[in-house]
């Protein structure tokens, strides 16, 4: 059915992004595993609602598989500020109680090391905005309605371009590509 079709497309696009992220993952990121698990456990036990909580049982770095999307989001939340910069402060709000100085120091040192890996950090920040590959019933209703309306919307846009004497070069390019075939 169409819903499964579009969910599969979403999954492939998300996995493609995760593959890009995985290819840029620095070798020293593996040292985050016990730190992330520690932070995740503390966030869970302190009832702090954050993606970091998903890291509570982390034993390996996440893979590029869609099933690990939430783990990557947890790592992004742990490492990055909302703006995508590397965290400067390590505190209780991300799972590090004040009395845990050793692990806080280890994490601060790792953050300093990771700050040199700009491409990885950029891709990690992008992961935060990736959607869940499965549509909720409401999301599916909106998407299905949009798909039904798209042909009418395209016709309306063509009419507007025609009335205003404008040229839609993108549509011309797509039509030419369709006419020539894909070889």
Please describe what each predicted stretch is.
Residues 165-176:
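Conserved pre-motif I regulatory segment
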Residues 2-167:
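Conserved ATP-driven helicase/translocase motor core recognized via long
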Residues 175-183:
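Conserved RecA-like ASCE ATPase "motif II neighborhood" in helicase/translocase motors
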